[in-house]
Design a protein with these regions (language model features):
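Short loop/turn motifs that recur once per blade in beta-propeller domains
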Residues: 26-39, 85-94, 143-151, 196-206, ...
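Sequence/structural signature of beta-propeller modules
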Residues: 1-29, 33
Length: 376
C-alpha cells in the first residue's frame, strides 16, 4: 500500500467493507475460534445468561496497527469461544463502547470508536450507533438526525432503558481534543438528547474513565486527558476524581455530584485501568493500569499494575483493597497432609501487569482479557 492509499481512510474503509460483504454473505457462527490478542475492545456480560461478548479492538505489533470488527461469545461452562459474523455489521474499530439490554431477547448497543491507517498517521473517528440482536444474531444500524459527535475513548452505561454517554476524545493526528458532553439515548423512542450541564459542576473533559450504573444513577471515576501549555511539552494527566450522575426519567432533572475520596483508593494515580460492575456486591472492581513519570526532559518511565481495588457504590462511595487469599487446604482423612507444606501463593498466579485490558464480572467471577504490556 503506497502513502496515498495509506492516508485515504475513506477508501480503505470502503475496501474493507466491500471485501467483508463479499466474504460474509449470510449470518455465520463458528466454533473453536479463539480471539487474537488485542486491546481497547469491549467485554460485555450477556444480559440474559452467563456468557460474555467480546467485540472489536486493536493490535500493534511495533510497526503496524490492526483493527478488528469480529464479535465473539465466551461460554464459561464450556470454556469455549464462538464467533459470529454477518454481511451487515459495524466496521473495524477500537476504543468504542458497548452496553447490554435484556430487551427483545437481549441486545448489545455499540457507539463510536476509532480506526487508523496501519502506520497510525491518520485517524477516523466513528459516530455511528448499532444494535445487535442476540436472539436473531443480526446487526442493525440506527439512523438518527441528532447524535453525538464522532469520538473514541468515551464511556456508556445502561440506566433503565436509557443509554448514557459521556466524554471521549478526537485525535486529528496533530492534536487530541478531549470532550465533556453528556448524551442520553432513549431505546424506546430511538432518540438522542444532549443534556446541558453547569460547567462548574460537571467532570472535566476526559477519556478512558470508569462509568458504572447503579439503581439511582451512574458513578464516574478517573480517566485521562492531556494538558496543553503554550511553549511547554504536552503533559498527560491521570485523573483520580469521582462523580455521581443522579439520574431521573425526567431528563431535565439529571445532575452531577462530586464525591470525596474515601478509603484506600488506587495509589499512585493511573490511567488505562478498567473497572467492572460486581452487581451482587454493589461494587466496582478495578484492575491494572499504568503510571507514567518523567525520567528526564526527554523520556518517561512507565509502571504497569496488576492489583485489584473495590469501589463500594452506595452512599458516598468508598475504596477498598481487594487482596488475594491463599486457597484453603482440602481435608481428606485418607490422605497424609504435611502441615509444613505451603499452599500455592496466589501472588504467583496473578495476571501480568497491563493497561487497556477488558474486564467483566459475571456470576461472581472476574474475567480479564487482553491489554497492553510494554517492554524496552
Amino acid at each position: 500500500m503506497d502513502e496515498v492509499q495509506e492516508e485515504d481512510l475513506d477508501a480503505l474503509l470502503a475496501q474493507y467493507r466491500a471485501e467483508w460483504e463479499e466474504k460474509h454473505t449470510s449470518t455465520e457462527e463458528h466454533t473453536n475460534i479463539i480471539p487474537s490478542r488485542r486491546a481497547n475492545a469491549t467485554l460485555t456480560p450477556c444480559p440474559l445468561g452467563n456468557d460474555l461478548w467480546l467485540y472489536g479492538g486493536e493490535y500493534f505489533d511495533g510497526e503496524r496497527c490492526l483493527f478488528y470488527q469480529d464479535l465473539f461469545r465466551y461460554i464459561p461452562e464450556k470454556n469455549e469461544w464462538r464467533s459470529y459474523s454477518s454481511k451487515i455489521q459495524p466496521g473495524p474499530r477500537s476504543a468504542h463502547q458497548m452496553v447490554a439490554s435484556p430487551a427483545g431477547g437481549g441486545q448489545l448497543w455499540c457507539f463510536g470508536g476509532e480506526f487508523a491507517s496501519t502506520k497510525q498517521t491518520n485517524f477516523h473517528h466513528y459516530r455511528d450507533l448499532w444494535v445487535y440482536s442476540i436472539a436473531e444474531r443480526t446487526w442493525e444500524k440506527v439512523e438518527t438526525k441528532v447524535r453525538p459527535n464522532a469520538r473514541s475513548g468515551h464511556r456508556m452505561a445502561m440506566w433503565k432503558h436509557f443509554i448514557v454517554l459521556f466524554g471521549g476524545f478526537v485525535d486529528t493526528g496533530a492534536r487530541t481534543t478531549y470532550l465533556q458532553d453528556l448524551w442520553v439515548f432513549d431505546t424506546y423512542e430511538y432518540k438522542w438528547k444532549e443534556i446541558k450541564q453547569n460547567d462548574l459542576r460537571r467532570p472535566s473533559a476526559r477519556s478512558g474513565f470508569s462509568f458504572l450504573s447503579t439503581p439511582e444513577g451512574i458513578v464516574l471515576y478517573g480517566g485521562y486527558c492531556k494538558k496543553y501549555v503554550k511553549g511547554q511539552r504536552t503533559q498527560g494527566l491521570a485523573l483520580e476524581d469521582a462523580w455521581f450522575l443522579q439520574m431521573d426519567e425526567d431528563l431535565s432533572k439529571i445532575e452531577w455530584v462530586k464525591r470525596k475520596k474515601i478509603g484506600y483508593a488506587p495509589n499512585p494515580p493511573r490511567s488505562g485501568c478498567t473497572m467492572a460492575l460486581w452487581a451482587n456486591r454493589n461494587m466496582g472492581v478495578l484492575f491494572g493500569g499504568v503510571t507514567d513519570t518523567e525520567a528526564d526532559e526527554e523520556s518517561m518511565e512507565s509502571t504497569f499494575w496488576n492489583d485489584l481495588y473495590g469501589y463500594q457504590l452506595p452512599g458516598t462511595g468508598r475504596w477498598i483493597s481487594l487482596n488475594m487469599r491463599k486457597p484453603k487446604k482440602k481435608k481428606n482423612a485418607e490422605m497424609n497432609v504435611d502441615d509444613d507444606q505451603e499452599t500455592e501463593d496466589p501472588a504467583t498466579k496473578l495476571p501480568l501487569e497491563r493497561y487497556n485490558s477488558m474486564i467483566a464480572v459475571q456470576r461472581n467471577t472476574l474475567y480479564i482479557y487482553g491489554g497492553i504490556y510494554e517492554t524496552g
